[in-house]
Amino acid sequence: MKDIAKTYNPKEFEDRIYSFWMEKGFFTPEIDPEKKPFTIVIPPPNVTGELHMGHALDNTLQDILIRWRRMQGYAALWIPGTDHASIATEIKVLDKIREETGKTKKDLTREEFLEKAWEWKDKYENRILSQLKKLGSSCDWTRTAFTMDEKRSKAVREVFVSLYEKGLIYKGNRIINWCPSCNTALSDAEVEHKEHKGHLWYIKYPVKGEEDYVVIATTRPETMLGDVAVAVHPEDERYRHLIGKTLILPLVGREIPVIADEYVDPSFGTGAVKVTPAHDPNDFEIGVRHNLPFVNIMNENATINENGGKYEGLDRYEAREKIVKDLEEQGLLLKVEEHVHNVGHCYRCDTVVEPLLSEQWFVKMEPLAKPALQVVKEGKIKFVPERFEKIYTNWLENIKDWCISRQLWWGHRIPAWYCEDCGHVTVSREDPVKCEVCGSTNIHQDENVLDTWFSSALWPFSTMGWPEETEDLKYFYPTDVLVTGYDIIFFWVARMIFMSLEFMKEIPFKYVLIHGLVRDALGRKMSKSLGNGIDPLEVIEKYGADTLRFTLVIGNAPGNDMRFSWEKVEHSRNFANKLWNASRYVLLNLDENDTNLYLDNLALADKWILTRYNNIVKEITDNLEKFELGVAASKLYDFVWSEFCDWYIELSKPVLYSDNEEAKKVTKSVLRYVLDNTLRLLHPFMPFITEEIWQNLPHEGESIMVAEWPKYREDLNFEEDAKKAEIIMEAIRAIRNIRAEANVSPSKKAKVIIAVEKEEHEKIFESGKNYIMKLAGASEVAIERNRDNIPQKAMSAAISAGLIAVPLEELIDLEEEIKRLEEEREKVLKEIERAQSLLNNENFVKKAPEKVVNAEREKLEKYTAMLKNIEERLSLLNS
């Protein structure tokens, strides 16, 4: 029979196997009306660098689902691709240019920058895709997409123009989130709010022509330079007399009115709020309602502009310091309180964002959000776990219009052209040569690009060739499941849903499988700053892709963060070793090319393993249907390690080493059948090792990845016999425990007595004598119906079907053992005395470190338990 290498070394076969799969075209499904499609689109990794452990988890989960469905006979399509990642990539490229040439963005033309950006994209896209291949990802590489390639660009242009024509995209002056570092607008979803310990400054605003003043509380005194009113609640008795009066804006001298607006919370601060419509979204709404002027006091780099008077040119924080000082000097600062509040930060560079009045492009969200909410509420799209549905619905129920323009160069340029002569804006699917109104050729395109997530939102259908009516769209759309992290539910998941409903009139996927973050062994998020990140390729290089995949998925529950450690990696590598060695044993004992399973004359152990395997098939399939991939992996681990390797292989040895050719033929067929089909169950999780072993087994078909997924078989259900085998195995475990407790050498045989009450149990142990003698080191197995026949000097253990007893003289030299135990007791007593002496010493307990004191307490507990055990053993031996 064929053999595999003596030791498991994934480097010897992983690349070879992946090339074999690629050559055979197994990853590229054909459109087959006879087959059901199963489709996943990859969350496209950003072309900003390399894959991290989160990508490895995300893609392992997807590959498990795709490989499983492929084996079930589906036309399984996994579409790969990458994302241009506007802000992140532009920052990286500009950093590289600055390092190499000393030039900043201001020194470059758009074309010069884009040339370098495309070079970057090509380099890192190739690297990312090769890393996905290293992981074993069975994507259809013939359909690889990029969010800025020609087909995707056509889709983006079509969506923008279509939404513009429907009045769902507009350009307007609104408060947006501005990142002074990235120098671009951000959508609300791109702002991360962090708790910040700041202050509340209480400032006096004098009433014009009176001695009175109004006190307002603010966390941002620098924005008072842009105040145009002070608002109070119309029902607030404290200020009703001031409504309509004029205040003098401190430091600036501008006259501003006191207005009444129900937005004001009378219980916050003083109940009077400064209104700065150009620098606060809520103030903006008040400004619109009351027809107030908009005074912008900040430049795009977060310095004060010409509207800030003497503070012009100062950074926002410098201005704050100076303004507070000036207010204090003029007696207008009443008090300062510490105050904890949430401050928005740029999700890319962590700079504090600035709410800024700016002319930008927006998507009108209310008409798009309603149907997106409806499909989830109706259960047409299900979140796994269900709890993440709340994040989705909460975001859509409170959604604001989406700011989609970015002041960047890398991205989809907004397809809007401005006429220099008549001022008309032409929005067009094709690049226009003249103004559509006046015919002037004096037109120029909008300088801004679209938010990265705009093109990503079209991913489920743009990857299949939309807006063309392609065969792929007809057959593979909608997709089946989206696998992604919980951190981009609103960034990406929600947007794909509303865009798909708008343009495909259908949901983009049926399930959203959410996974958590991969954290380090201490539970910390992996990051460059902490230096605790582990490169997936490093793990693959040391241990192989299968070990990494299995480490990431075993025990992993949907939606939960997982801890990654080298210790877990070692466990998975040991599992692969165990499987490899067990497979070698099977291969060395098989007959050439016999793929039959012989069900006549099955031994008890054969029936047990076939029943257990059969149940595992049902359980694993059920787990995968429910997206319980971590549970499935754990069950496979236990089945392979404990039941197949530790039990069945050991139970098979007496048969294979016997002269009974018929029994050998049957057991060999069971070994091959269970191994073959267990490899199939394991294949989605550990594709390389399973393929390598399977190719060496007698098999039919080209590859395990297109072999049929195992099905539950009624003819392999031997539940009653399996229960009998479990009883025999329980007895073997009990005998092994007795031998271990008595320190008996593995080579020493001992008589075993099994006392039973029921005749059925007597028959079971009679039939299992051979197994007990071989696996428990028994010289003889005596089955008794009367417990009185058990010698007094025997070690015993109760099991479900009776009592196991091993006479002590069979195990040990009684006198020698008594002597050894008495010596051990003396040592233990000395340790107890030492620990008690320390713990009774008040000085030690008070002055020694808590850690040291606790260690002594634990030692005392341990030695006390040891003493009890020794004395029980001595009592038994002396009785």
Curated annotation (Swiss-Prot):
Assembly and oligomerization? Monomer.
User: PROSITE patterns attached here?
Assistant: AA_TRNA_LIGASE_I
| Cysteines paired by S-S bonds | none
The keyword Cell inner membrane appears for this protein:
no
Identify its protein family.
Answer: Belongs to the class-I aminoacyl-tRNA synthetase family. ValS type 1 subfamily.
**How is this protein annotated for GO cellular component?**
cytosol
Where the record places motif 'HIGH' region is 45-55
Q: According to its record, what is known about the domains?
A: ValRS has two distinct active sites: one for aminoacylation and one for editing. The misactivated threonine is translocated from the active site to the editing site. The C-terminal coiled-coil domain is crucial for aminoacylation activity.
Gene3D superfamilies, sorted = HUPs (3.40.50.620), Isoleucyl-tRNA Synthetase, Domain 1 (1.10.730.10), Valyl-tRNA synthetase, C-terminal domain (1.10.287.380)
The UniProt entry's coiled-coil ranges are: 804-879
> Where ATP is bound, by residue?
K528
Pfam families, A to Z? Anticodon_1, tRNA-synt_1, Val_tRNA-synt_C
Name of this chain's protein: Valine--tRNA ligase
Q: Please give the chief subcellular localization of this protein.
A: cytoplasm
Query: Could you tell me which HAMAP family the record lists for this protein?
Result: Val_tRNA_synth_type1
